[in-house]
Regions:
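Flexible, low-complexity linker and terminal segments
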Residues: 1-18, 22, 27-28, 225-234, ...
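Cofactor-binding active-site loop characterized by glycine-rich and histidine/acidic residues
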Residues: 2-142, 161-163
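Conserved thiamine diphosphate
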Residues: 20, 111, 159-226
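Structural motif
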Residues: 58-60, 112-116, 140-145, 188, ...
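Glycine-rich beta-alpha junction loops
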Residues: 64-66, 148-150, 206, 240-247
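Short acidic/glycine-rich loop or secondary-structure boundary segments that cap or lie
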Residues: 70, 152-154, 208-211, 245-249
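A short, conserved beta-to-alpha structural element at the edge of catalytic cores
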Residues: 139-160
Length: 277
């Protein structure tokens, strides 16, 4: 990159935006393990809420799992941020019930922007029934689903999304499809339901894919806002692949490589369903 381009980026404030913290995020370290991209997802979601000007009417429903403490990091009182900005609402849901809680909030306050933020154990295991029926009913919420192919918070047990032959504490010799079944592909499954209006799978492996993930989350939020205005219904799903260096016993770079080379074979990236024009 030449000096003129670097200067242009600096003049446009690109470096400051990349290094800055969105105003709705508290100025504190997160609990996420080193090398985990959960906090990157949290940051781009917060950036979008700020950029779209929807903080005062947004409610995020947090799960049980690695993101259980997400509510610690977002501001809730106007006094914690600029007086003209405000914070978002947060709700901590019982294990697997985030989409059910989000449904209740949305039905009681249909003009709010409601986001459920869940991992694969919460969304695709104990919460499978809630997830499927929320999408089948076409509840007007945006669901962010983190798929790291393992139970992260509880110590690395096999998840519904664990890959064939992938090792975990409960499959120390690797997952065998014959005895343990295969990975559940939530995007593919939920996109068959009439109530699902948008489903896309993205990854957090490099800058290009992170920007694609941000665009996908923005699309899901835009659809919800459009439905709020028009009275239409439909649920949006953004599935995000990311690594778990701690429980995979890998370094961050190796975990990103595993996502890019192995996980995407089992969980292809792309748009599986989008609104009809």
């Amino acid at each position: 990159m030449d000096q003129q381009t670097l200067k242009q980026l600096a003049d446009e404030g690109v470096y400051e935006r990349c290094a800055s913290r969105p105003k709705i995020l508290m100025n504190m370290p997160t609990h996420y393990c080193p090398g985990c991209n959960h906090d990157t997802v949290l940051k781009i979601m917060a950036e979008l809420i700020e950029e779209m000007g929807i903080a005062r009417r947004t409610t995020i429903v947090w799960p049980v799992g690695c993101s259980a403490f997400g509510s610690w990091y977002v501001t809730h009182k106007v006094g914690q941020v600029r007086e003209d900005f405000g914070g978002v609402d947060s709700v901590d849901a019982p294990h697997g019930r985030a989409t059910a809680v989000a449904t209740g909030i949305k039905r009681m306050q249909p003009n709010r922007v409601v986001i459920s933020f869940q991992g694969d154990g919460d969304f695709a295991a104990i919460g499978t029934a809630e997830s499927v029926h929320t999408f089948n009913r076409g509840e007007n919420i945006t669901s962010i689903f983190i798929n790291n192919a393992i139970y992260g918070m509880t110590g690395g047990q096999m998840a519904p999304t664990t890959l064939p032959q992938q090792k975990s504490t409960t499959s120390p010799y690797g997952r065998t499809v014959k005895d343990m079944g295969g990975p559940i592909r939530m995007c593919e499954m939920l996109s068959t339901l009439d109530g699902t209006v948008y489903a896309e799978r993205v990854a957090m492996t490099d800058a290009r894919h992170i920007l694609r993930a941000k665009r996908a989350i923005k699309r899901g939020l835009e659809i919800q806002l459009w439905h709020n205005e028009t009275g239409r219904r439909g649920t949006s799903l953004i599935e995000i692949l990311l690594g778990c260096p701690t429980n995979w016993k890998m370094g961050p770079a190796q975990a990103n490589q595993y996502v890019a080379e192995e996980m995407t074979r089992c969980f292809p990236l792309g748009v599986f369903k989008q609104p009809e024009k």
